[in-house]
Amino acid sequence: MAGGRIAHATLKGPSVVKEICIGLTLGLVAGGLWKMHHWNEQRKTRSFYDMLEKGQISVVVEE
């Protein structure tokens, strides 16, 4: 038989450096998205209170 040698995939252990880099990248991306969400909420809140202070809106129901 000529097919005595078969190329098998060799399994390697986990690469610590690669896992640290992937974890760091995912953490930074998730943190950046979280910060952008909070900046957007802060902008909305600041805009609401500015409009409330200027009298453009009111929280009291008019009868």
UniProtKB/Swiss-Prot annotation:
Major site of localization recorded for this protein: mitochondrion
Q: Which UniProt keywords apply?
A: Membrane, Mitochondrion, Mitochondrion inner membrane, Transmembrane, Transmembrane helix
Bilayer-crossing residues are 16-34
Does the record carry Membrane as a key word?
yes
Its subcellular locations are: Mitochondrion inner membrane
Q: What's its job?
A: This protein is one of the nuclear-coded polypeptide chains of cytochrome c oxidase, the terminal oxidase in mitochondrial electron transport.
Family (UniProt): Belongs to the cytochrome c oxidase subunit 5C family.
According to UniProt, the name of this protein is: Cytochrome c oxidase subunit 5C
Species of provenance: Oryza sativa subsp. japonica
Lineage per the UniProt record = Eukaryota, Viridiplantae, Streptophyta, Embryophyta, Tracheophyta
* Gene name for this UniProt entry: COX5C
